[in-house]
């Protein structure tokens, strides 16, 4: 956020020093300087999901909001996850989408920026662990569904995401 929203540059050091979530964590997606017309947002809990849903409905954005019930602020595939969009609200299981349940150990993001970059590159180059790839596929698929305004099924959107990664495009 500090790279794109100039005002956040001044708040960043204070937020880091506090070492706990602040109101700026909630405001960040709402003050995006690019003013997106659609957005997929991961939230840490169901209270945040309800809050963002109400705000997005009022401002008229096409949205998808996701939360893994076990606390991840994205679709982690470690268990059930909830998705709410302009069109529906539903709890999914990884198996509903044809994915295996992932273990938290398979989600390690890397302790350094370089390790995180390596995982990112591995996903894009189709050499990531199956769980890492599946998590990206699931999150990307719901993002595609938001962009398509619900005109495609989630299964079609998973296929689009898979084709994109597998083809390297």
Task: Please provide the spans of the model-predicted regions.
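Glycine-rich anion-binding loops and their surrounding alpha/beta cores
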Residues: 1-169
